[in-house]
Each structure stands twice: as C-alpha cells, then as structure tokens.
C-alpha cells in the first residue's frame, strides 16, 4: 500500500493529528504570555528597587537630614484570587519599605519599616484583579529614546536634513537646516538658534575652536557668519549663553549665570533628564565610528598611540576587512582628542571625543572630520557634551553624504513598554510627588523626634498606582469571550496611550506593514476601523529583550561548511538588517546543507534569490511571521490577507458552546494556544491522579505530597459568557508538570475548540442565502450543537438614606402574592427559579418623605411600629431581555464581616443564566473571514441530502468565495470531508500545510470522488440537483453578536426629562427615532394624520399620550393631539433670552399655554402675580368708587335733613 500523505503527531496526552508539515520544528514555541509575566517579575525583582534608588535619598533644604532607602518586601496578599473576585476587591499584597533617616548634625540614625500601600499582584494567567474584575495591561509601542536623523525637502525642492535627540524624559534637542544652508538648533520645541550659539554656550567660544572641532564645511561657515558677535563686553561664550536663555525664557532678564543653571538642569541633571539604558545604547550605536566610517576614504594615516605602528595608511578605503582590523583600536580610544571648555561655559570638565579625518564623497579633495562620542559606559543616563558634539558632527556629515537617515517606523527604532515599565513610570510619578511632601515635612517638623513614618505620606503613591490600574488607556477590561481572545489580549501591542500616538494624528506610514515586522509583529491581525495598524499582535515566536526591542529567533548558518545549524540566535530588527536570512521552507539535505544552489532570502526590505554561500541565517519556522490567532487558520496561504484579518479577529469573538469540538482540520496551534491561555487547569508537579470529580482533582506527587486543584464551574466571565472547566484526566492516570488536567471554556481534550465541525455545502437555495446569509438544519438547534450559556449579574444594595435605611424585605407595597412566590422570607429570589422580564429578584423598599400624621395614623404607628411609615418600592427586577434561571445568589452584609462601600448595609448579587440556542439573526463565521447571518432554520427533512441519506447541516452561498479570494475555505471543505470519512484529525500548519496534491491524495484515500464533489438530492422532492456539488466539513463558529442582544421593541417606556421625548437605545428601553428624513418620507406621501400622531401622541405631547392610552384601554376614539412639549421648550428658551414670545390663534387671540405644573393651584407663576396685581388695583378702584358714591349719598341725605329742619 502506498504511504499515506502526512505523518502522525501527538498534541498533549489526549489528541493525535495527521500533520502535513514538511519542516521539522527546531524550536519549541515560547510560553505565549511571558511578555506579561516576565515583565512583571522584572518589576518586582529590579524595577521597584531602581525606582527607590532613583528618588531616594531625599535631603532637606539645609542638608542636615537625609532619608535613605534600605530594602523593601511584599508581604502575604490579603485575599486569594477567588476571594478578591467574590468580594469586588483587589488581588494585592502590602508593600513594606525599610527606610533610614540620618541626622547629619547629631549623627543619629533611625531605621523603620514603612507601609507603602497595597500593590496589585499579577495572577499566574498574566492578569490583574482590580475591584473584582480581571484586567490586562496592554504593552505599548513607542519611539525609542536615542538620536535620529531625517531628510526633508523644502517647497523649492532643496534637500535638507534634521536631527532629534529624544530622551526617555526631559527636553528634546533638535537640529535642522534652512534654505540658505544655515544650521539651527531648537531646545524643547522653542524658537531656533544658530547651531554655533549652542556650541559656544557649552564653552567652545571662538570661531577657530569650532572649525578645529568640526572641520571646515560650507554649512558651518554660513552658520558662523550668521552668528555675529553683537556685544563686545561679553565673551563669545557668555553671549551664546544669553542667546540660549532668551529663547528658552523669553521676556525674562537674561544673565549668563541663570542660563548656565537652566542648561545644566535641562540636559545634565539626572533627575530631570534621563536617556535610560536603552537611550544610551541607541545613542552609542548611532554615533559609533565603526559603522559611520564604513566605505569612506581615509584622509590621514592612523597610528597606534602605544607602539607608534601605522595601522592604516592615508587614502585607504575602509572596507569591511579594513574595519575589522581597525575596530579594536577605535574601541580603545584611537585618535582621542580632549578639548578644554572655557571657564564660563555650561560644562567645565574636559571633553574627550574621537576625531578621524576622511575625504568627502561629494568632493574627494576636501577633508571632513568624523567625530565619535568616545563610548561612555551604560550608567551615564544623561546626555554629555561629547554626545551633543558628535551628533552635530553626524548632522553636518549628512550634507557631505556621510552617514544615513533613520526610518522612524523601523522596529529597531520602536520599542515595547510592557507592564513592568509602565508600572515603574507610574510609581516614579507617585514617588516624585511624595518627595515634595517629605522635603516640606523635614523643614517644618522637630528634627529630634522625627521618624521616617512621620515624614512619609503614601497617599500620592497609592493614588498614582490606583489611577493607573483604574483609568489608564492601557489598563483594559480583559476580553474574556473565549480563551483565544484572552490570550490575544495579553499579547496585544498598542501604539496609543500616554506618550504614544493618537488616532487622528497617526498617518498611513505608521499604520502600514513594515519589512522589520517580519517575525516580530503580525502583519495580519489588527482591528478594522480607526485603530487599524495602531494596535498589533506579537508574532508567535517573538520575545522582548531587556531594552524593550522585539527579537525573533533564527537558525545560524555556518558559513565555512554551509550547514544550517540548530543554534538559535534572537535578533532585533536593526541587527537583522546586517544579515541575509533564508526562508524556513528552503529545502535542506540530510546533513543540514541547502539542497539548492540558490535560495529565496530577505535582505532588509528586498526579497531576493541568493547563492547559498551568502546566507547568514534561516527562519526557525514558517509560522514565526504570524500571531497566535492567525496561526490557527488552516490554509492561510490560500486566503487573501484582508479576509484572513477578519478570520483572525472573528475567532476571538467565538462564544463558548456547551459541547465544543476541536476542528478536524486544524493547524497544530490549537493545543499550545489553549494550554497557554490561562483557561485550562494545568498540572504543577509530576504525579498520579488520586481523585477526580466535577469540582476537584487531587494529584499525589512523586514525593508523597498531595496537590489539590479546584475546578471552576459556571462562573460568569468578563463578557457574560460561561466560564466552565471539565476534567479530562482519569483516576490513576500518570501526569507530568504542565499537562492539562481540565479543559476550560471552548476547549476539548486540551485543544482550542471555538466552534463545531458541520457538514456544509456551497449552493444557493431559494434565495435564502443571498448576501452571505446562512441556511441551517434544525438538527443543530435540536441537538444543541450551537447552544451557548450566558450568565448575567444583577445587584441591589440597601443603603442608608437621609430618611432612614433602605430595607430588603418581602413586604412590598402594591405587589400581589403571585409576584412574590419565588422570594424567600428575606425577599430574595430562590436559586433555580425561572424568571421572566420584569419579575422581582430582590424586594427592597426605600423610605419616602415623612408627612404630618393624623391621629389614627399615629395610633397605627404606635401599635405596628415602622410598618405604617410611607415607603417606596425600589426592588430589583429582571431587565428587558434578561429572563432565565437563577443560578446563584450572593449576599454580603456588614455583620458577616464583608467589606462594603460606605453607606451600604447589605449587598445582594443575583446571577441569571440563559441557555441560548442558535437563532435566525445570529452571526456565524468560518476561520477564513467568511461570515454571515443565519437567515433560515429548516426542518431536517427539507435539507438536501447525500446519496447515503445524510442531511446537510449548513448551506453557504458559493458567490461568497470568488470575489473574496479566500480559497482556503474550499480546501478546508474537501480535507474536512476526507478527515470525516477517515475518522482522523489533521493538522495543516500555516505556510507549511497540505499542498493541493496532499489534499487530493487524502480525498482519494477516503474513497471520495476524484474531484471531491457529489450528487445531492433535494430534501423536499427527493430529486437529485442538476450538477455535482462540493460537500464537505467546515469548522463554523457562533459569534458573540447574537440577535437576542440586539433585537428590541417598545410600546411604552421612559421619557427624557427636558424634551419629554422617548429615550433611545436598547439599554434605556428606548424608542425608534423618527428623524428628519423619515418625516420627509411621510410628507412626500401626504400622510398627515400618521405624521401628526408620530410627532405628538407617540412622542412628546404629555397630556395627549396619557389620554390616548386611556382611550385605547377603554376602546374609545383617540382624542385630538395637543401641543408637543418640545414646542414649549422652544418658547421657554426664547423667553429666557428676553424675547416676549406668545402663541396666537387665527383671530390673533392669545392661546394660553398651560404649563404641566399649572395643575397645582398653589404654584405661583409670573403671569399669576401680574393677574393678582391687576385684580388688587381693580378692587381698590371699586372700593374708591363705592366710597365716593357713599359720600355723595351721605351729602344728599344731609342736605335733605337740613332742608327739613328749615321747613319745621
């Protein structure tokens, strides 16, 4: 029998796959989350100590007291990981620091251990638990400190150059040329000054000294001419100092002294200026004479200063071979020159540089000075005058065609700040704030009784750490949809965040794939949308070195023998640029030599065919180019990169299913990614399994000790999916360290299992799979193939209010006994109860405002105590769409010793679990970016069936393949069918997987037709379809975008306070917005009444909508609408601007716009006051008139009486 395609490989203890890989793995994959764990470990071991030694000792202003750092230790954490989760606490350990306070006057020394706050600890999975939730600190990609040179072209097409010295923290120093070939410097983005001014300020004042140091060049002459000696009373150095000060502090009186202090503080004070180790390394590397002199012609004879021997003659071209003999002499300080700055310069120490004269490539007659910075050691973290002079020399040499400009997007110039460093920077900020406080306290308090404890205020330190974990852009809520999402999140690299880029400013170049990403950052996996290219993923084999640069492993090629050795070198991007690297799939002979004379290789950005004697290194593995999620896509090499990007991103959104299956067609990456994700339960020591059940596994170690492993059951993950582990070991099984004991969510037999292997066919069916829609068999619903479990957490807290404490109780006003049937005697729902939208979970009442009680109420109050008081129902109810089964209830009270936030007496958490079957409207996807929405679930009997009667599970649209160019799915379909027939699992690693021949050979081996197509019968009629069809097994996943979370409808619900219009969005139980364009649509059809009710009764006619509701309930005709509230708001806004706005009818009579509150008679408005005043005036006038009439009447009577008397 012919040998079968592929060979069997074992993944873990429980799974074998037939692998089609041709290249044997030379190097194991590293631990995939070591970027997190190693960095944090470094921080605990070294980073913290570095920080303390940086800030301390702190001296007081007089220099009498000194506070020194002795040591620190982290004590035992207060909570375990599980307890921190349950109590909404932090998983952290108390940090204790031993400090020593020395009084230099009395010689007294006091040492004391000071508590420095709780420090968050990293869990074994590489996460932090902050306030009970798991968070990940994402690594940041930033520009590395160092010295950079760039070319620029001005608007007239003239070429110029620029240079920047970037520190880790401190002032930037920039150099540039202008159109007249004059060189300028800028300090910290201020106005520019001629380059020679800064040189003079450093203490090299005369023109002769400047020409002696830098040599003669046109640019330098132009600059010196521009920089005239204006004030003869100052020396050139003093004048230079004053010029610099004027630019840095415009408007302040300038003196040479203040300028000296300022420049010293800006560049030469280690507290304010820090290049960091990486900056010093990059500066030395860039200014290194060995690389700068390559291929130039010497303009002087170089002599060994010790023996006087000639090393290299004048006129020699400095090739690689010559440089190899010259290198040791250069490193030992060949041609060192010491310059002595003038007494009034910024720096008074002598400056030693190396100067070597060469001929200019542009003008072979002219000599040019190349200045090196004299190799300072690593501890020098500030910039030195020699560095400034050497970088100026490099800058001036660029005009002569010596040296090269830097590519800012090259990964040799970008570095990673991982957790440890980000934390260290944050800690430094806290310590620096604390330092100020300590200094102040030293000067205020009595020195005799002072102790370190009294000096230290830990608040700023604690606050800065808390702020970092709680609100930094890089501290993110962990994506825990499935283990792959979890793993990818920990390996993410972000260019955003503090000190990084912003989305709006990031251009195309920064986001683009760069050749230096090869083997370091994945070219595929990045989000679609505004963050594309700014958020990346670490490649599978990549590591981060001590300087923060990403390294990737290569196999060394022995140049003498031509053998590819198994010796692995990790190279950073800038070192790799010097070598030629062959691809991993270059054919090799048995003895490790190349099988062909010419191989494909990479030299910087070029892909070339190279003869094998020029090759220095070879790739370790074909999958070193891509990230973990991308490496899980079979036949990646047959997919278009845009679709592969979607495939890699969508795998992270797969929902864990009830009984997942590992893919039949895998890539061999499934085991490693599941093992390292943190979701699996791993064995810590070799031993034998002694006990297994659903909640615990016990392993007896070889040395007799017993290890207990608790299994997590149905815990809610960060994304609301179910986090559940299942044992996969048996009693008596021998296990080794690192073996998988229990599967986590989305795992099967220790492998990542995000979805299911389903029988698929590419064919259209009645138009139901138009536009990528998916038709599915009811079997997948019935057999719970795509059923997932979702857990939601709801909480209710009883607080103290001004009117008295809230109470959790069964006795709720206006709630019938039927609604309380599942509540216990405390008023809390029982576990296992089935609840629907709006059902009570926790009964709670809040006291209302106390009104004056009548005599009867007082009597009732005296008899029944509190019960008669007025309370409001504030119970926790199941929100819209949250129904399910109560899975767990947790109760936290003060009495039980739980830590609750201030003012809270009791906290109840209810967990509701939902079992969601697959539905029309759910989103599904394959691994090749082929996504779609389920459009129809059909009975099994209507689905097309195979000749043996097997009904198809899923029908996909064949039109989804050609234009998308993800052919990988077709190959997966065929190979999957063959694997199903043969009953095997296969592995086809990326870029080294099954070839077309392998696929067809396996298809034939499985006894399928040679073109892998088959006759298919219509399930409704039993007739065969016209053509033969591709049927196979595809691995399909159900994504987190489920219709249950998105579908939403509202009849009545909450309204916005000001406009009285319905709220929007599912979360607020809002309505559908009927916007401007929708109004136009109704206007176009003249649908006046429909439009009127949409704008009034259905929206913000407050009175009208209540009356409409009543009318509908009573079955009466709907009343006419009133005035919309938004119109009233408009009127009020205009009135508030002081405009007298009134509403008139057709007859110009004013219409009363009654306010909503006018129903309350006791409310006094401005109109009412005016009316009242008018009424008062009218009453007074009436009274006066009445009095007048009365007076007149009295007069008449009096006259009458007088007349009568006269008659008598």
Swiss-Prot record:
Coiled coil: none annotated. It is an enzyme of class 2 (transferase). One of its GO terms (biological process) is DNA-templated transcription. It holds the Pfam family RNA_pol_Rpb2_7. Its EC number is 2.7.7.6. The keyword Transcription applies. Keywords: DNA-directed RNA polymerase, Nucleotidyltransferase, Transcription, Transferase. GO terms for cellular component: DNA-directed RNA polymerase complex. It catalyses: RNA(n) + a ribonucleoside 5'-triphosphate = RNA(n+1) + diphosphate. InterPro entries: DNA-dir_RNA_pol_bsu_ext_1_sf (IPR042107), DNA-dir_RNA_pol_bsu_external_1 (IPR019462), DNA-dir_RNA_pol_su2 (IPR015712), DNA-dir_RNAP_su2_dom (IPR007120), DNA-dir_RNAP_su2_hyb_sf (IPR037033), RNA_pol_bsu_bac (IPR010243), RNA_pol_bsu_CS (IPR007121), RNA_pol_bsu_protrusion (IPR007644). GO terms for molecular function: DNA binding; DNA-directed RNA polymerase activity; ribonucleoside binding. It comes from the Bacteria. The RNAP catalytic core consists of 2 alpha, 1 beta, 1 beta' and 1 omega subunit. When a sigma factor is associated with the core the holoenzyme is formed, which can initiate transcription. NCBIfam families: PRK00405.1 (NF001616), rpoB (TIGR02013). PANTHER family: DNA-DIRECTED RNA POLYMERASE I SUBUNIT 2. Belongs to the RNA polymerase beta chain family. DNA-dependent RNA polymerase catalyzes the transcription of DNA into RNA using the four ribonucleoside triphosphates as substrates. This is DNA-directed RNA polymerase subunit beta. It comes from Enterococcus faecium. The gene is rpoB.
């Amino acid at each position: 029998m012919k040998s079968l395609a592929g060979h069997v490989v074992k993944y873990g203890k429980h799974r074998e796959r037939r692998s089609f890989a041709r290249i044997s793995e030379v190097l194991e994959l590293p631990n995939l989350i070591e970027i997190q764990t190693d960095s944090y470990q470094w921080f605990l071991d070294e980073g913290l100590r570095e920080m303390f030694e940086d800030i301390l000792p702190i001296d007081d202003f007089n220099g009498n007291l000194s506070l020194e750092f002795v040591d620190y230790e982290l004590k035992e954490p207060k909570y375990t990981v599980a307890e921190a989760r349950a109590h909404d606490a932090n998983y952290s350990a108390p940090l204790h620091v031993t400090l020593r306070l020395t009084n230099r006057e009395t010689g007294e020394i006091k040492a004391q251990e000071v508590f420095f706050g709780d420090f968050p600890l990293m869990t074994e999975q590489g996460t932090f638990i902050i306030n009970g939730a798991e968070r990940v600190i994402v690594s940041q990609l930033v520009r590395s400190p160092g010295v950079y040179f760039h070319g620029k072209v001005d608007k007239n097409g003239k070429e110029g150059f620029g240079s920047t010295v970037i520190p880790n923290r401190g002032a930037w120093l920039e150099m540039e040329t202008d159109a007249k070939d004059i060189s300028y410097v800028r300090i910290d983005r201020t106005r520019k000054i001629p380059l020679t001014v800064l040189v003079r300020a450093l203490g090299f004042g005369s023109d002769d000294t400047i020409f002696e140091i830098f040599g003669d060049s046109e640019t330098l002459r132009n600059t010196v001419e521009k920089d005239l000696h204006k004030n003869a009373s100052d020396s050139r150095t003093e004048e230079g100092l004053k010029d610099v000060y004027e630019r840095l502090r415009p408007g302040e009186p300038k003196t040479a002294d203040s300028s000296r202090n300022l420049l010293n503080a800006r560049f030469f004070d280690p507290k304010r200026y820090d290049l960091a180790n990486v900056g010093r390394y990059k500066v030395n590397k860039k200014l290194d004479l060995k690389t700068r002199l390559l291929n130039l012609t010497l303009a002087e004879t170089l002599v060994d200063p010790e023996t006087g021997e000639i090393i290299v003659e004048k006129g020699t071209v400095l090739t690689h071979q010559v440089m190899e003999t010259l290198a040791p002499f250069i490193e030992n300080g060949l041609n060192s020159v010491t310059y002595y700055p003038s007494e009034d310069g910024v720096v008074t120490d002598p400056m030693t540089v190396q100067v070597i004269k060469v001929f200019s490539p542009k003008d072979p007659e002219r000599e040019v000075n190349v200045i090196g910075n004299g190799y300072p050691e690593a501890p020098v973290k500030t910039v030195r005058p020699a560095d400034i002079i050497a970088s100026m020399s490099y800058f001036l040499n660029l005009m002569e065609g010596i040296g090269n400009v830097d590519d800012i997007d090259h990964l040799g110039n970008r570095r990673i700040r991982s957790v440890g460093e980000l934390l260290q920077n944050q800690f430094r900020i806290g310590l620096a704030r604390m330092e100020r406080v300590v200094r102040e306290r030293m000067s205020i308090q009595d020195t005799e009784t002072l102790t370190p404890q009294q000096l230290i205020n830990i608040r700023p330190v604690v606050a800065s750490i808390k702020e970092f974990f709680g609100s930094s852009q890089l501290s993110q809520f962990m994506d825990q949809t499935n283990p792959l999402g979890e793993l990818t999140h920990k390996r993410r690299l972000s260019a955003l965040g503090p000190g990084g880029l912003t989305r709006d400013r990031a251009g195309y170049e920064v986001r683009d794939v760069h050749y230096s990403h090869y083997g370091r950052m994945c070219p595929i996996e990045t989000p679609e949308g505004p963050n594309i290219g700014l958020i990346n993923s670490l490649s599978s084999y990549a590591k981060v070195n001590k300087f923060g640069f990403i390294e990737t492993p290569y196999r060394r090629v022995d140049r003498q023998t031509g053998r590819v050795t198994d010796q692995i070198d990790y190279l950073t991007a800038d070192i790799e640029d010097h070598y030629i690297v062959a691809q991993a799939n270059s054919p090799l002979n048995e003895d490790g030599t190349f099988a062909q004379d010419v191989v494909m290789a990479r030299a910087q950005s070029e892909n070339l065919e190279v003869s094998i004697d020029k090759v220095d290194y070879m790739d370790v593995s074909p999958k070193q180019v891509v990230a973990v999620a991308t490496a899980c896509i079979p036949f990646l090499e047959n997919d278009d990169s845009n679709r592969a990007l979607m495939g890699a991103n969508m795998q992270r959104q797969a929902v864990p299913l009830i009984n997942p299956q590992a893919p039949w067609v895998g890539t061999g990456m499934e085991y490693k990614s599941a093992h390292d994700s943190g979701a699996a339960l791993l064995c810590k020591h070799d031993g034998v399994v002694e006990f297994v059940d659903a909640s615990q596994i016990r392993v007896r170690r070889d040395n007799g000790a017993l290890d207990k492993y608790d299994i997590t059951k149905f815990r809610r993950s960060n994304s609301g999916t179910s986090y559940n582990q299942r044992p996969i070991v048996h009693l008596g099984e021998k296990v080794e360290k690192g073996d998988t004991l229990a599967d986590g969510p989305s795992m099967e037999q220790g492998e990542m299992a995000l979805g299911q292997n389903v029988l698929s066919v590419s064919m259209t069916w009645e138009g139901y799979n138009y536009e990528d829609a998916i038709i599915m068999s009811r079997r997948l619903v019935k057999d719970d193939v795509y059923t997932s479990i979702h857990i939601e957490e709801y909480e209710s807290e009883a607080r103290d209010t001004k009117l008295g404490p809230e109470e959790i109780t069964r006795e709720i006003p206006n709630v019938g006994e039927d609604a309380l049937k599942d509540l216990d005697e405390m008023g809390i729902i029982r576990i296992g109860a089935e609840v629907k939208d709006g059902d009570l979970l926790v009964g709670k009442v809040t006291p209302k405002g106390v009104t004056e009680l009548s005599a009867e109420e007082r009597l009732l109050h005296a008899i029944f105590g509190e019960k008669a008081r007025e309370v409001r129902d504030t119970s926790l109810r199941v929100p819209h769409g949250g129904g399910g089964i109560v899975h767990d209830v947790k109760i936290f009270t003060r009495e039980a010793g739980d830590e609750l936030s201030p003012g809270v007496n009791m906290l109840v958490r209810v967990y509701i679990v939902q079992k969601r079957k697959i539905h029309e409207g759910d989103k599904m996807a394959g691994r090749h970016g082929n996504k779609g929405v389920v459009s129809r679930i059909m009975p099994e009997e209507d689905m097309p069936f195979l000749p043996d009667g097997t009904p198809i599970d899923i029908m996909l649209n064949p039109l989804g393949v050609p234009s998308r160019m993800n052919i990988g799915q077709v190959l997966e379909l065929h190979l999957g069918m063959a694997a199903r027939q043969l009953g095997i699992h296969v592995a086809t690693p990326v870029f080294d997987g099954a070839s077309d021949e392998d696929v067809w050979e396996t298809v034939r081996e499985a006894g399928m037709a040679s073109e892998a197509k088959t006759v298919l019968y219509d399930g409704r009629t039993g007739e065969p379809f016209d053509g033969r069809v591709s049927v196979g097994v595809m691995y399909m996943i159900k994504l987190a975008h489920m219709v249950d979370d998105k579908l939403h409808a509202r009849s009545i619900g909450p309204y916005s306070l000001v406009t009285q219009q319905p709220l929007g969005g599912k979360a607020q139980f809002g309505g559908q917005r009927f916007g401007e364009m929708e109004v136009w649509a109704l206007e176009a059809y003249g649908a006046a009444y429909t439009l009127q009710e949409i704008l009034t009764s259905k929206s913000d006619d407050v009175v009208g909508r209540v009356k409409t509701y009543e009318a509908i309930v009573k079955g009466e005709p709907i009343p006419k609408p009133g005035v919309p509230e938004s119109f009233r708001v408009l009127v009020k806004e205009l009135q508030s601007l002081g405009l007298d706005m009134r509403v008139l009818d057709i007859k110009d009579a004013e219409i009363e716009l009654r306010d909503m509150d006018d129903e309350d008679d006791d409310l006094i408005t401005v109109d009412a006051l005016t009316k009242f005043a008018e009424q008062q005036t009218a009453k007074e006038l009436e009274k006066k008139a009445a009095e007048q009439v009365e007076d007149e009447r009295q007069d008449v009577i009096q006259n009458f009486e007088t007349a009568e008397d006269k008659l008598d």
